[in-house]
């Protein structure tokens, strides 16, 4: 079983949007697709067959391209999760639910501090809620309640879920990363006081997970590169920093999209 893994990274994922659109143009399909945070949004657009939708959703609009960034981030997430699929950028739920591929959306359960891998095969609202949970950045967005769980961004616990993909039966993976090799994950230990103040009373395990996240990501990348050397994983990533996490420059974002598309096209012989 072949699989596709899409790392998160907010607007850095414009690179990923270009990669995935190139896949669609070349009729490349996967048996299993897993996405984290913004990568999860791109995953469902890929499986619904909506070329260009990821780019449109990530690109700043007139109502979200300026102003106080934190309030805009909160506004953007709600619009992206619950409004865009029905209004500005209609999502093809039918095509997504009819896809033969397994799709998993990664989120972090805040009480256990563990990753959960959501699937959804028929309920539109639950699909959107799971996507929202996967994208809910700690310290910025509220937790998302699903069933008895409370969830935040999946990148806290499993930024690049290749081990999960192997555990469900994949034997060959394409992994699309949103950052160049010299860049690492957010180091929450540098803002330990803020993390503890926000979550320490009710979510002590989450606090520990956040503080350890930088080291966990580094270890995960070491394993990733071992699989790459063994020929079980093919990695696609930007060669240089194209955009910031919350980039507002449309020109920079357009360049990142083009870079992703071109890198994927160049690597096509390795991918096919």
Predicted features, each with a name:
Residues 1-36, 44-272:
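Patatin-like phospholipase
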């Amino acid at each position: 079983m072949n699989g596709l893994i899409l790392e998160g990274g907010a607007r850095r994922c414009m690179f990923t949007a270009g990669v995935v659109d190139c896949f669609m143009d070349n009729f490349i399909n996967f048996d299993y697709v897993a996405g984290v945070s913004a990568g999860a949004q791109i995953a469902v657009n890929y499986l619904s067959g909506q070329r260009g939708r990821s780019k449109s959703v990530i690109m700043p609009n007139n109502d979200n391209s300026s102003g106080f960034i934190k309030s805009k981030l909160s506004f953007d997430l709600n619009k992206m999760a619950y409004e865009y699929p029905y209004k500005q950028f209609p999502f093809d739920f039918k095509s997504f639910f009819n896809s033969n591929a397994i799709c998993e959306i990664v989120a972090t359960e805040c009480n256990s501090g563990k990753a959960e891998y959501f699937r959804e095969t028929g309920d539109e609202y639950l699909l959107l809620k799971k996507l929202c949970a996967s994208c809910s950045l700690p310290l910025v967005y509220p937790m998302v309640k699903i069933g008895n769980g409370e969830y935040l961004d999946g990148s806290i616990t499993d930024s690049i879920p290749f081990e999960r993909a192997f555990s469900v039966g994949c034997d060959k993976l394409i992994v699309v990363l949103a950052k160049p090799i010299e860049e690492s994950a957010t180091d929450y230990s540098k803002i330990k006081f803020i993390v503890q103040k926000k979550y320490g009373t009710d979510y002590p395990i989450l606090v520990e997970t956040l503080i350890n996240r930088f080291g966990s990501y580094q270890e995960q990348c070491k394993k990733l590169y071992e699989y790459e050397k063994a020929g079980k994983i093919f990695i696609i990533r930007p060669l240089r920093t194209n955009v910031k996490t919350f980039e507002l420059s449309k020109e920079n974002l357009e360049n990142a999209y083009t870079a992703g598309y071109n890198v994927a096209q160049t690597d096509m012989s390795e991918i096919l």
